[in-house]
A protein has these predicted regions:
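Catalytic domains of cell-wall/extracellular-matrix polysaccharide-remodeling enzymes
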Residues: 137-228, 233, 252-253, 264
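Substrate-binding cleft of extracellular glycoside hydrolase catalytic domains
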Residues: 87-145
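C-terminal domain-boundary segment and adjacent tail
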Residues: 189, 286-331
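A short alpha/beta connector and helix-capping loop motif
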Residues: 48-72
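Bacterial Sec-dependent N-terminal signal peptides
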Residues: 1-22
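N-terminal pre-catalytic segment of deacetylase/amide-hydrolase enzymes
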Residues: 18-38
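Structural preference for beta-strand elements that scaffold enzyme active sites
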Residues: 36-38, 63-67, 87-93, 158-162, ...
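Acidic (Asp/Glu)-rich catalytic clusters
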Residues: 27-29, 54-60, 77-89, 106-119, ...
Length: 331
């Protein structure tokens, strides 16, 4: 997601949206001054471990939204779960990269249709930079459309769209196609266009760029879509402090404290917090070395202390489904 604020605006929007005290949360009917949060899990469908973590975090924890990587091998199991657990807020984690060394996936469109999206093995590129170097905007649109169509063909209607590794925010042309596909299917796209306090601090964005980003948010709002006020996207880089035991109890305690601190830093308005809840098996280390932080996300979401904090502070949890319903009622 490091590309988010670097390229978000260059989509041909030239107007500047002056910042006001009214958040998108308020425009959607939430009380003024309240923190309204989506606790969102990325990477569903990537592996058995990812699916198990998602299922536990959504049914036993406080996480309340998820997005699915449609090119990945464990998608059928996740879609079955979503059909059985009706009402879960589930979107698409639009995927244009395959970042792991020995665990790869390929474009749904097929190499002949999107040759710029594949490496010499026929898999998607491992990095965002490689996608930018080799793929055209037409290929990107073709592939993300195929991912939406696969979901719909499986009887899975996504509540929202977002971007794996932020690839769709890497260039203005990619961003245009992301928004275009969302509008064509009337599916909300994840885009923070409000005060952006947290994401600006993370990315080091200046005031001029933030004003431009707010212009994109205004455009999406005018098109009938909900818009985020902010985005928290720093949990993936977390690790246990040096010297701490690496057992489940310690991981849970430390990462719960991390999320409580993160929620304290959230400003009033509508914020999405990104996480990667995973229940790592003995196989997961052969996929990725990120098991500790991913397991920590799961354990934190299931910690009664986190639920208690959210309730005590009066933080409102919402979903993309609710946001679109609220937006549809506003003229």
């Amino acid at each position: 997601m490091k590309y988010f604020l670097l390229m978000l605006l260059a989509i041909g929007v030239t107007f500047v949206h002056a910042q006001t005290d009214t958040t998108y949360a308020e425009r959607l009917g939430f009380p003024r001054g309240k923190k309204v949060v989506i606790l969102h899990i990325d990477d569903a469908g990537m592996s058995y471990d990812s699916n198990k973590g998602v299922m536990d975090a959504l049914t036993k924890g406080v996480a309340n939204s998820v997005s699915v990587m449609m090119p990945c091998p464990w998608v059928p199991g996740m879609v079955t779960f979503l059909k059985e657990q009706k009402g879960i807020d589930a979107g698409l984690h639009l995927t244009l990269t395959s970042e792991w060394k020995d665990y790869r996936w390929v474009p749904l469109s097929g190499k002949p249709q999107v040759p710029g999206l594949v490496d010499s093995t026929g898999s998607m590129w491992t990095s965002v930079e490689q996608v930018v170097q080799h793929a055209s905007a037409d290929e990107v649109e073709r592939e993300i459309t195929a991912q939406v169509e696969r979901a719909l063909g499986m009887g899975f209607k996504p509540t929202h769209l977002d971007s794996h590794m932020g690839t769709l925010f890497a260039t203005s042309e990619f961003l245009q196609r992301y928004i275009k596909v969302g509008m064509q299917y009337r599916i909300p796209v994840m885009l923070p266009g409000g005060h952006n306090t947290l994401i600006a601090a993370q990315m080091g964005a200046d005031d001029a760029r933030l004003q431009q980003v707010r212009g994109v948010g205004k455009m999406l709002w005018a098109a009938g879509f909900p818009v985020l006020d902010d985005l928290h996207n720093e949990s993936y880089g977390w690790d246990l402090p040096a010297g701490k035991k690496r057992d489940a109890a310690t991981i849970q305690k430390e990462k719960t404290a991390y999320y409580i601190a993160a929620l304290q830093s959230v400003k009033p308005g509508l914020t999405m917090m990104i996480m990667h809840c995973t229940a790592p098996t003995e196989v997961f280390p052969f996929i990725s070395d990120s098991g500790t932080t991913r397991h920590g996300d799961l354990l934190a979401m299931m910690d009664p202390a986190l639920r208690s904090y959210i309730q005590k502070e009066g933080i409102i949890l919402t979903t993309w489904r609710e946001l679109m319903e609220r937006r549809g009622k506003i003229k």
